[in-house]
């Protein structure tokens, strides 16, 4: 039947597809077919590693658009049926895997099962999903498992297609017993089974090791992650709060024993925390394909501006278990950060956005970041943060340099990494 549908029509579409490729200036293999001047060829040959990556990214995006046009015509659909068109939410590959994730995701740390009610959680997920977000992140430790329960219940209630979602969870702190925490084979398998039961799902898309475990051999960790993937309990695995050396060790073990390596590292990334994502992870991406999924783009709310005049009673820093955040805010370094935020405000005003939107867009301007996880406690906060998508095109090199001149914390690497 498919052959019948794609007979004459398929031939016509193929011809149109070929025309589109010619217009785009490159073939499926990525080779330039358009004539170039000698000066242009010389210019291309001198591209920096980052320039080459950006050129390749643009070529892949154009090729993906060509293929999407072909598919839509084949199915007698228009581009209006695609999520990107209807919501404007860009998607990126998770590392060098084929998994496509929305460049903004919704996290559940502190909020789900703790700071907000189940009704507010449902509103947040609905707003995110209808805005094109397909990535929802949680962990077994969040609210002692309650965050997973709430997340799973909302997905079931909404009836969203499982294939349209990317659900991730993290393992390490599962319970009080010695065998209920860590990254032993026992806890990875049992912990993930428990997460799936709470989520009411057959599998998660990515399971993360929530921190390194010095008490468990790396081979055991990698074998356990490979096992849960082979058993269909997860599609991919990644790391969180791991050092570059530890991630590289996991990759080496996986290659040595023909197992599955990690595809992503979850790392903190914001205006005041840059070293790991901007210096260490690019090396891992170019060498072994490990991408970056970042969290806390507003530095636990510090960048939101709510702490400019102290710590509000309803804020995260006012919670008993977050005294460390309160201490950070009232410290000398915290006061310096607040002053820098005041200096950044004119840039946000000039771009027609809020400071939180500027901060999230600043994270997204890094093409090495696959997705930025948002943590919002109100629908208004989430809608505001999602608005960073409209600010992203305004993040020119001039604007980024302005921000760097104010922050004065840009990390530098002596190496160039080529893919």
Swiss-Prot record:
Q: Give, as one word, the top-level EC class.
A: oxidoreductase
Q: What domain of life does the UniProt record list for this protein's source?
A: Eukaryota
What GO CC terms are in its UniProt record?
A: cytoplasmic side of plasma membrane; cytosol; juxtaparanode region of axon; plasma membrane; potassium channel complex; voltage-gated potassium channel complex
Compartments where located: Cytoplasm; Membrane; Cell membrane
Catalysed reaction per UniProt? a primary alcohol + NADP(+) = an aldehyde + NADPH + H(+); a secondary alcohol + NADP(+) = a ketone + NADPH + H(+)
Which residues are responsible for catalysis? 142 (proton donor/acceptor)
Instruction: For this UniProt record, give its keywords in alphabetical order, as a comma-separated list.
Output: Cell membrane, Cytoplasm, Ion transport, Membrane, NADP, Oxidoreductase, Potassium, Potassium transport, Transport
- InterPro entries (UniProt xref): K_chnl_volt-dep_bsu_KCNAB, K_chnl_volt-dep_bsu_KCNAB-rel, K_chnl_volt-dep_bsu_KCNAB1, NADP_OxRdtase_dom, NADP_OxRdtase_dom_sf
* Major place of residence: cytoplasm
Q: Where is the composition biased (Basic and acidic residues)?
A: 30-43
Q: Does the keyword Glycosyltransferase apply?
A: no
Q: How does it sit in the membrane?
A: Peripheral membrane protein
Give the EC number.
1.1.1.-
Outcome (variant: residue 316 to E) = Nearly abolishes NADPH binding
Q: Report residues binding NADP(+).
A: 108-109, 115, 137, 210, 240-241, 266, 295-300, 306, 316, 375, 377, 381, 384-385
Molecular function terms from GO: aldo-keto reductase (NADPH) activity; carbonyl reductase (NADPH) activity; molecular function inhibitor activity; NADPH binding; potassium channel regulator activity; protein domain specific binding; transmembrane transporter binding; voltage-gated potassium channel activity
Q: Region Disordered: start and end of each range? A: 1-52
Annotated tissue distribution: In brain, expression is most prominent in caudate nucleus, hippocampus and thalamus. Significant expression also detected in amygdala and subthalamic nucleus. Also expressed in both healthy and cardiomyopathic heart. Up to four times more abundant in left ventricle than left atrium.
Gene Ontology annotations of biological process type? learning or memory; negative regulation of voltage-gated potassium channel activity; potassium ion transport; regulation of delayed rectifier potassium channel activity; regulation of potassium ion transmembrane transport
Asked if the record carries the keyword NADP, the reply is yes
Q: So what family is this one in?
A: Belongs to the shaker potassium channel beta subunit family.
Q: Which PANTHER family does this UniProt record tie to the protein? A: HYPERKINETIC, ISOFORM M (PTHR43150), VOLTAGE-GATED POTASSIUM CHANNEL SUBUNIT BETA-1 (PTHR43150:SF7)
How it assembles, according to the record, is: Homotetramer. Interaction with tetrameric potassium channel alpha subunits gives rise to a heterooctamer. Identified in potassium channel complexes containing KCNA1, KCNA2, KCNA4, KCNA5, KCNA6, KCNAB1 and KCNAB2. Part of a complex containing KCNA1, KCNA4 and LGI1; interaction with LGI1 inhibits down-regulation of KCNA1 channel activity. Interacts with the dimer formed by GNB1 and GNG2; this enhances KCNA1 binding. Interacts with SQSTM1.
Instruction: Spell out the protein name for this chain.
Output: Voltage-gated potassium channel subunit beta-1
């Amino acid at each position: 039947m498919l052959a019948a549908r794609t007979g004459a029509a398929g031939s016509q579409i193929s011809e149109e597809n070929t025309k589109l490729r010619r217009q785009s200036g490159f073939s499926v293999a990525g080779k330039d077919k358009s004539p170039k001047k000698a000066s242009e060829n010389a210019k291309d040959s001198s591209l920096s590693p980052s320039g080459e990556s950006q050129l390749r990214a643009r070529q892949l995006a154009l090729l993906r658009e060509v293929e999407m046009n072909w598919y839509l015509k084949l199915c007698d659909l228009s581009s209006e049926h695609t999520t990107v068109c209807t919501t404007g939410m860009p998607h990126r590959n998770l590392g060098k895997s084929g998994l496509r994730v929305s460049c903004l995701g919704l996290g559940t740390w502190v909020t789900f099962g703790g700071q907000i009610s189940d009704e507010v959680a449902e509103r947040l997920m609905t707003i995110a999903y209808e805005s094109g977000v397909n990535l929802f992140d949680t962990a077994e430790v969040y609210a002692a498992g309650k965050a997973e329960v709430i997340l799973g219940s909302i997905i079931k209630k909404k009836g969203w297609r499982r294939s349209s979602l990317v659900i991730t969870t993290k393992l390490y702190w599962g319970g009080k017993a010695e065998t209920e925490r860590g990254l032993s084979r026992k806890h990875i398998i049992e912990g993930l089974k428990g997460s799936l039961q709470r989520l009411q799902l057959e599998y998660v898309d990515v399971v993360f090791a929530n921190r390194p475990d010095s008490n468990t051999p790396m081979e055991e960790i990698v074998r356990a992650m490979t096992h849960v993937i082979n058993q269909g309990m997860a599609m991919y695995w990644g790391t969180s709060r791991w050092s570059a050396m530890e991630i590289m060790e996991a990759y080496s073990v996986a290659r040595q024993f023909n197992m599955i390596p990690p595809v992503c590292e979850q790392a903190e990334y914001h205006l005041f925390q840059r070293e790991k994502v901007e210096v260490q992870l690019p090396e891992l991406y170019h060498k072994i394909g490990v991408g970056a999924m970042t969290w806390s783009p507003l530095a636990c709310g510090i960048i939101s501006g709510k702490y400019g005049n102290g710590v509000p009673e309803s804020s995260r820093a006012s919670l008993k278990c977050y005294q460390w955040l309160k201490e950070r805010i009232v410290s000398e370094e915290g006061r310096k950060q607040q002053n820098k935020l005041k200096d950044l405000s004119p840039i946000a005003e000039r771009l027609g956005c809020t400071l939180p939107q500027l901060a999230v867009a600043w994270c997204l301007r890094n093409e090495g970041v696959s997705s930025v996880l948002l943590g919002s406690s109100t629908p208004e906060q989430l809608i505001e943060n999602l608005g960073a998508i409209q600010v992203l095109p305004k993040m020119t090199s001039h604007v980024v340099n302005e921000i760097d001149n104010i922050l004065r914390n840009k990390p530098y690497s002596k190496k160039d990494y080529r893919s």
